[in-house]
UniProtKB/Swiss-Prot annotation:
Entry PTM: 4'-phosphopantetheine is transferred from CoA to a specific serine of apo-ACP by AcpS. This modification is essential for activity because fatty acids are bound in thioester linkage to the sulfhydryl of the prosthetic group.
Domain of life of the source: Bacteria
BP terms from Gene Ontology: lipid A biosynthetic process
Keywords, comma-separated and alphabetical: Cytoplasm, Fatty acid biosynthesis, Fatty acid metabolism, Lipid biosynthesis, Lipid metabolism, Phosphopantetheine, Phosphoprotein
Source organism of this protein record: Polynucleobacter necessarius subsp. necessarius (strain STIR1)
Modified residues (O-(pantetheine 4'-phosphoryl)serine): S37
Family assignment from sequence similarity: Belongs to the acyl carrier protein (ACP) family.
Protein name: Acyl carrier protein
GO molecular function ontology, one term from the record: acyl binding
Sequence ranges assigned to domain Carrier in this UniProt record: 2-77
Gene3D superfamilies hit by this protein: ACP-like
Length: 79
């Protein structure tokens, strides 16, 4: 597991109150991890803070799984 993946999973665990061990890359924030719309907004804000990036609303709506969050963070970290 690379550093970005670990950081994303740590944020997800903290924001949603779930154990890191229960978080899989394919986990859906809403369907698998029990997030509601406010949770997902707070999650996006935490990711923005952690990685020093801005996630536009139209992009944030597409980030529905842990893997999509990892992929987005990686794309911004490299770009």
């Amino acid at each position: 597991m690379d550093n970005i993946e670990q950081r994303v999973k740590k944020i997800v665990a903290e924001q949603l109150g779930v154990a890191e061990g229960d978080i899989k890359n394919e986990s859906s924030f809403v369907n698998d991890l029990g997030a509601d719309s406010l949770d997902t907004i707070e999650l996006v804000m935490a990711l923005e803070d952690e990685f020093g990036i801005e996630i536009p609303d139209e992009e944030a709506e597409k980030i529905t799984t842990v893997q999509l969050a990892i992929d987005f963070a990686k794309s911004k970290a490299q770009g």
